């Protein structure tokens, strides 16, 4: 059994069929331990083809897990994300743990995302009926600077949070070397 699992894992992480399952984070490879959602999303890119439209319900780890960094970057840089809403499962799926996070993403499988229209940490699916009124606009520069290594998406729930984060990220990070600084 363990040999079969090892062979299967090598197929997904080392084979040519899946290219976005082993991102580099902080200088190290961070392999996807056969997370089926990540594997499925990568296959969706191929199935949808260039210019295809995709709407998916995905586990929250796709939007904030280090192993799914390359999948997020593919959606941002080689696709146009039209909307993203993440939820905390507060009674939405009664038979699933209420701490579970998931997201609904829609994107075009070509182009590039300039501004992400999203809202995070929601508890009621009714938000989907009025998303245009509640979604915040997050410029791509914020997504690039927020988490430079693993490229996780910040859990933003208001336009004010976008503005504050933009101001914070316009300054050098505490870990950056700045010439002439003390």
Describe the role of every protein-language-model region.
Residues 1-15, 23-27, 49, 92-182:
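Polynucleotide-recognition surfaces of large bacterial nucleic-acid defense/processing enzymes
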Residues 1-85, 125-128, 132-139:
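SAM-dependent methyltransferase catalytic-core segment centered on the flexible catalytic loop
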Residues 81-82, 90-92:
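Conserved beta-strand -> loop -> alpha-helix junction used to position metal-binding or nucleic-acid-contacting
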């Amino acid at each position: 059994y363990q040999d079969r699992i090892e062979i299967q894992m090598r197929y997904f992480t080392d084979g040519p069929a899946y290219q976005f399952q082993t991102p580099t984070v902080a200088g190290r490879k961070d392999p996807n331990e056969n997370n089926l959602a990540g594997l499925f999303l990568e296959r969706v890119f191929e199935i949808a083809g260039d210019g295809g439209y995709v709407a998916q319900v995905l586990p929250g780890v796709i939007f904030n897990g280090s192993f799914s960094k390359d999948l997020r970057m593919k959606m941002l840089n080689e696709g146009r994300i039209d909307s993203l809403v993440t939820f905390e499962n507060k009674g939405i799926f009664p038979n699933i743990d209420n701490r579970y996070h998931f997201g609904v993403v829609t994107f075009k499988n070509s182009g590039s995302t300039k501004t992400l229209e999203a809202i995070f940490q929601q508890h009621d699916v009714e938000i989907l009926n009025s998303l245009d009124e509640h979604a915040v606009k997050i410029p791509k520069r914020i997504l690039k600077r927020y988490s430079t290594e693993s490229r996780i998406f910040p859990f933003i729930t208001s336009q004010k949070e976008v503005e504050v984060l933009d101001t914070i990220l316009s300054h050098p990070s505490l870990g950056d070397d700045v010439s002439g600084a003390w």
